[in-house]
Amino acid sequence: MNAKNLLLWASLAFAMPMAAQTPQEDFKRDITLSGSNYVAYRGPQKQLTPAPKGYKPFYLSHYGRHGSRFMIGKKAYDVPYFSLLKAKQEGKLTAKGEETLAKVKMIRDEAKGRDGELTPLGALQHQGITRRMMERFPEIFAGNANIEARSTLVIRCILSMENGLHQMLRMNPKLHIFHDASDHDMYYMNQGDRYLDSLKHSVGRRVVREDFARKHACYSRVMQELFNDPVWVKQNIDQSDLNWRLYEMASSIQGTELRGKVSLYDLFTEEELYQNWLQSNLGWQVSYGNSPYTGNVQPFSQRNLLMDIIEKADSCIALPHPGATLRYGHDTMVTPLTCLLDLNGYGEEIRDPERIASQWFDYKITPMATNLQFVFYRNKANDVLVKVLLCEDEATLPIKSDVEPYYHWNDFKAYCLEKLKGYKK
């Protein structure tokens, strides 16, 4: 697919609406939204609220996930392929199984040697995000503004950053750009925390996930579609695992060059896709959200990132034309930071696993290239406002404001610092 066609596909994807009352309604309208964190980035879905009179944008701070990628780990491709190949060699595949094996081989071949790498669409996603930044907030990126960009050490993140920066330079060659990817900055860019990580492996989390998975298991019919001998399947196939890997593979195609050419969605009914999504969605919430099953503290994994955002903003506010601070990393940073800030209510505790799907929607929080933008405005009296964009749409915060979705910087900062004070290891 050439660059012109890629850009056309991306622009169409960005134009697609996402608002619906329930996940089932969303998935019925667009089946690819059932793909959890594999959902290809859609871009903004709403118009921005005009700034209060007299306020102009002057600084932008950002943290974004890399764009669409290939799946991570050889098993993601090898387990489905070799499971189906073994069945074929032993005469145990149905006609649907033969068809699926051919598709899986094509998908595996495309990904060969590209473990977790950025796809061409992933690159386009970051070009589009940067282009819209500059179009929506031209004052920030005017003239020889300074752009400070950092990435984690993972190549898909570095390439996401480079695609964004190249787009900036195409639109304004006068920009002064500093960019880096160093272990020096990982304490906030990709913070590790042994204590919080240990809670993710707690017995409580494991039990709730296993119980939920048993309750929502939905692989029997899929196995019957693929294989002609149920006794052989029981003896040779981990049915739950194969179903899950095929669901993930089906979800991942939308971010690759095979989208529109190959699909595995015909393996699943709408209800089966929903049941698989429920399990993925729960996994994200209990691992990175405000969940009693992981101590109600996982969002604090991003305490250093939030402090970096605050401190850099404070220093940039003192400058006449500070430009932008850009950070490129992972879903495992954007998601807990979204919860730490309690954007759109995603920081609320959810105790009942069966209620998670009515309050938490991973495809709206954690798609490929998901990003948070903190856009700063000021007036001639130097009063500073900030608004937060999640996936380029205005987000709400539990902060009183007379100009919502804009918030007074001092109120926002006080809210964040009070949050951080509340964390005790």
Regions found by a protein language model. Name each.
Residues 1-23:
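Bacterial Sec-dependent N-terminal signal peptides
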Residues 21-148, 152-325, 329-425:
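Signature for phosphate-centric chemistry
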